Amino acid sequence: MATNFLAHEKIWFDKFKYDDAERRFYEQMNGPVAGASRQENGASVILRDIARARENIQKSLAGSSGPGASSGTSGDHGELVVRIASLEVENQSLRGVVQELQQAISKLEARLNVLEKSSPGHRATAPQTQHVSPMRQVEPPAKKPATPAEDDEDDDIDLFGSDNEEEDKEAAQLREERLRQYAEKKAKKPALVAKSSILLDVKPWDDETDMAQLEACVRSIQLDGLVWGASKLVPVGYGIRKLQIQCVVEDDKVGTDLLEEEITKFEEHVQSVDIAAFNKI
């Protein structure tokens, strides 16, 4: 029963042989020998095409004389003729490029020859040697005898520096004078006065307080170094408004405590005084 089943079953028992053959084939194709042969074939492809074209031309010439020439061979010959024509055109263009290169090389050689011929004529001539006469001994000039007038001038030289002492005294006096003038000039300049800008909140007792009268009372305060500025009424609540007034004071003359004391003297109108803002100018 088992043998009958194996007889009817399609099993490929020789598959390993085909696998080995395929592996050897690809190894030969990818090996170094195959690569070298492909390089040689690629290098000589043009020569083989030319040789094949010549053979086909000779065969076509021999076959065209006979009556049994077929139409298929004539088509192949036409393709070969076109291929040969393109190769001839490429060959002519390469020849033209080679000729141009040869002409350029010949021009360069001629230029080099001209430069080599002209270089010896431009060599710098060696400078002529100058004859130097032997050294002669030079005698020093004879000293003239000193005259009495020159002796008197030498006697006038102050060896102890008395003139320098007088010049030092004059320079010290000049320096002191300049310092005194600078001090006087600096004293005449007005000294910088430190000032501050103060924003006051003056609050009344109730909504029945006359705010115009309150502002008049505040502005009636006149102090040295105090300048009143702008003012406005700011609502507080329940119909009550406070007086917000700005002033500029000199820090050395007017202080915030003094301002508060002077404003709170108006007890009938003023309840309290607060400093809302304080900035140095």
From Swiss-Prot:
User: Region Disordered: what ranges?
Assistant: 118-172
Q: Where is this region: Leucine-zipper?
A: 80-115
Q: Which GO terms describe its biological process?
A: cellular response to heat; cellular response to ionizing radiation; cytoplasmic translational elongation; positive regulation of transcription by RNA polymerase II; translational elongation
Q: Which residues carry this modification: Phosphothreonine?
A: T73, T129, T147
**Which controlled-vocabulary keywords does the entry list?**
Acetylation, DNA-binding, Elongation factor, Nucleus, Phosphoprotein, Protein biosynthesis, Transcription, Transcription regulation
Write down which residues bear the modification named N6-succinyllysine.
K117
Sites of the modification N6-acetyllysine? K17, K107, K117
Provide GO CC annotations from the record.
Answer: cytoplasm; cytosol; eukaryotic translation elongation factor 1 complex; fibrillar center; nucleoplasm; nucleus
**Bias (Acidic residues):** 149-169
InterPro entries according to UniProt: eEF-1beta-like_sf, EF-1_beta_acid_region_euk, EF1B_bsu/dsu, EF1B_bsu/dsu_GNE, Transl_elong_EF1B/ribsomal_bS6, Transl_elong_EF1B_B/D_CS
PROSITE patterns, per the entry? EF1BD_1, EF1BD_2
Q: Where is this region: Catalytic (GEF)?
A: 173-281
**What Gene3D superfamilies does the record tag this protein with?**
3.30.70.60
* One Pfam family per UniProt: EF-1_beta_acid
A GO molecular function term, named singly, is:
RNA polymerase II cis-regulatory region sequence-specific DNA binding
Q: Does the keyword Protein biosynthesis apply?
A: yes
Q: In which tissues is it expressed?
A: Isoform 2 is specifically expressed in brain, cerebellum and testis.
Modified-residue entries (N-acetylalanine), positions:
A2
Cleaved signal peptide residues: none
| Positions carrying Phosphoserine | S37, S44, S60, S86, S106, S119, S133, S162
Q: What induces it?
A: By homocysteine (HC), may mediate accelerated synthesis of free thiol-containing proteins in response to HC-induced oxidative stress. Also induced following exposure to ionizing radiation.
Q: Which family, according to UniProt?
A: Belongs to the EF-1-beta/EF-1-delta family.
- PANTHER family linked to this entry: EF-HAND AND COILED-COIL DOMAIN-CONTAINING FAMILY MEMBER, ELONGATION FACTOR 1-DELTA
Oligomeric and partner information: EF-1 is composed of 4 subunits: alpha, beta, delta isoform 1, and gamma. Isoform 2 interacts with HSF1 and NFE2L2.
Protein name stated in the entry? Elongation factor 1-delta
